Amino acid sequence: MATLQGTPVLILKEGTQRTVGRDAQRMNIMAARVIAEAVKSTLGPKGMDKMLVDSLGDVVITNDGVTILKEMDVEHPAAKMIIEVAKTQDNEVGDGTTTAVVLAGELLKKAEELLDQDIHPTVIARGYRMAANKAVEILESIAMDIDVEDEETLKKIAATAITGKHSEYALDHLSSLVVEAVKRVAEKVDDRYKVDEDNIKLEKRQGGSVADTKLVNGIVIDKEVVHPGMPKRVKNAKIAVLKAALEVKETETDAEIRITDPDQLMKFIEQEEKMLKEMVDRLAEAGANVVFCQKGIDDLAQYYLAKAGILAVRRVKQSDIEKIAKACGAKIITDLREITSADLGEAELVEERKVGDEKMVFIEGCKNPKAVTILIRGGSEHVVDEVERSLQDAIKVVKTALESGKVVAGGGAPEIEVALKIRDWAPTLGGREQLAAEAFASALEVIPRALAENSGLDPIDILVELRKAHEEGKTTYGVDVFSGEVACMKERGVLEPLKVKTQAITSATEVAIMILRIDDVIAAKGLEKEKGPEGESGGEEDSEE
């Protein structure tokens, strides 16, 4: 509402809420901090889990930051911005989602203290941006080069990502599987590795224990052989991968066939049978003894395939069809008339097996597979789901380390080192940006503090010890949450890719600056509020005011 020469002018729609100035900033900062506090207790190997129950009663138990935030039904726009940070971190590097969110929350908390001292948000934003650039510079200077051929180092990186997610008793086994899987699908381009993590399929099946999880040098698909008369096990498989259906095509035009005597009907049926038999004969002539089809397989075609001793699977997902082709070296066939033996892929064994209560088809022993499968096992559905999430993180982290070749120590060591260096550098800025840079340094210390708190250690004692160690030049010293002491994280094998840290700091800083610069929130009246519980208009409520 505004007034012009005493006349009230209605600018915004009735029911629109507007929050201006310091109130808007405080409200946004509070919303972001609430989200950060929600996941703070999950940080690190000793972090707690969250149980999330959705509106349908489905339960998710996890301490994976991005999963928690995705499952939360958040309404506040500033809180949604913080959740976007976690999603970006997850998509880019796979790990460090909780770190990014907690850091964003702490940066906003420190910014609020500066706002109380009448420091302008633009000055704080400028100081934060300069400090973030300096932080990335410092991280790059303390990063360690790794030999990408050194599997032990890669296993340590994978183990750091997996630790704390229901997988500790099979940690060595799982980290070995991850490294082997990533190296199988990695391609060398000009002395650098390129990894497409989509070529690593994670197939989960409840039953057994986490230690029963295994890597298959090929593909496992959640399907069964289509006909009981077909072989269930084929050695030295020649695999045809089809996008076309093994069915008689229906014409696109509406045609009507008038049949006047039984012979014509028999000819019609015989022609259909002949067409299906020709399709199967073409596959057999090309030398195929295994067929994976993206579309349907006619019942009669199934019979002919079984008669020819060919194992067939139908209605395979397109993503699986592509992975099968990559794993066994087959060409995807769209027209059966052009199939040749050169189009077929090869595998040592294709077999239908019962895993748990259901049947699955295994394609194993591919010579040079460019797609592999990790079959995840576990005692309960929640354990299997959490192991799947931890393996997804580990795969992305190992991929990032392979591609960049640089790592930093874990356990809060890089954050303490960066905080120390930024405090030394801040006085060179002059002006009020110096205060923002110092606040940035203090905010970084929330990571080692949270690691200590979540492990039941005294955060003040740990921080004092860490600062002392880093003052003495011990740049890799961090919190060992298992022994409860400050130690060299490099020696303890706690390593993370450099990109995980740089991405977390830049993402957290960007979102903190964006939220800080908002001084006016104009919220339109939501549809839910306009309608009553029966879908009636909320007019009565408006008239009462």
Swiss-Prot record:
The keyword Nucleotide-binding applies. GO terms for molecular function: ATP binding; ATP hydrolysis activity; ATP-dependent protein folding chaperone; unfolded protein binding. Keywords: ATP-binding, Chaperone, Nucleotide-binding. The keyword Nucleotide-binding applies. Gene3D superfamilies: GroEL (3.50.7.10), GroEL-like equatorial domain (1.10.560.10), TCP-1-like chaperonin intermediate domain (3.30.260.10). PROSITE patterns: TCP1_1, TCP1_2, TCP1_3. Molecular chaperone; binds unfolded polypeptides in vitro, and has a weak ATPase activity. Belongs to the TCP-1 chaperonin family. Forms a Heterooligomeric complex of two stacked eight-membered rings. This is Thermosome subunit alpha. The gene is thsA.
